[in-house]
């Protein structure tokens, strides 16, 4: 019992240090901190660094899906930047039943009409119950999707992406998902594979302790007659 108490005290101290370091050393492009995935956040367009109408951009965020049964059967929005016509530029949505990701982008049509084309890019089977880094990078008509620093999908858009620099970004609206989000970042330029890998290696805390918590988790189990009745992870 004494050893267990020492371990728990050390964990509390490490967690406290991680929170303090994460608070003071977050990069300027980092627009969100650790937040409940079931709660709605709004990122004002005015807070985006070098925010322009350029169709070349990069979004990066970290998320942890804890319980996939939460809102099972309903699409779960990770983030959305909707223009005045409620069209995505872009939106990122988790699947209703499968652990898939759908990225939607409104594009200009090739004809002279003002009608938009909504293009979707899908990524299947993203990891659950661990921290995941998702990066979407758009250059011209090419949309690259990175998970944990690796390029997993490239989609070719039917037209140039629409961007409304005045549109705010909403994170996990309508109940979101069971878990957490953190370290949302934005750049007004595309990202190459090396940059994407560097973003991932920087960790969701941007510190040594952040990388430590990204790599390791602790499971606490509740036993009754040596049988596990419940557990939780930190």
Name each region found by the language model:
Residues 1-234:
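Extracellular glycan-associated modules
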């Amino acid at each position: 019992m004494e050893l267990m108490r020492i371990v728990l005290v050390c964990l509390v101290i490490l967690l406290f240090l991680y929170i303090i370091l994460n608070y003071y050393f977050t990069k300027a492009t980092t627009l969100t901190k650790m937040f409940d995935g079931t709660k709605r956040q709004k990122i004002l367009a005015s807070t985006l660094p070098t925010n322009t109408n350029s169709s070349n951009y990069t979004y990066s965020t970290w998320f942890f899906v804890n319980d996939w049964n939460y809102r099972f059967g309903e699409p779960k929005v990770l983030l959305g930047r909707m223009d005045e016509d409620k069209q995505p530029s872009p939106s990122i949505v988790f699947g209703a039943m499968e652990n898939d990701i759908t990225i939607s982008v409104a594009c200009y049509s090739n004809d002279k009409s003002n009608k938009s084309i909504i293009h979707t890019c899908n990524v299947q089977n993203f990891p659950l119950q661990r921290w995941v880094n998702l990066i979407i990078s758009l250059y011209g008509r090419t949309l690259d999707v990175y998970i944990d620093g690796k390029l997993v999908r490239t989609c070719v858009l039917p037209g140039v992406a629409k961007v409304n620099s005045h549109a705010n970004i909403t994170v996990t609206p309508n109940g979101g998902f069971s878990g957490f989000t953190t370290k949302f970042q934005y750049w007004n330029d595309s990202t190459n594979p090396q940059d994407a890998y560097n973003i991932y290696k920087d960790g969701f805390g941007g510190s040594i302790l952040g990388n430590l918590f990204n790599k390791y988790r602790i499971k606490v189990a509740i036993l009754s007659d040596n049988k596990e009745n419940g557990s939780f992870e930190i």
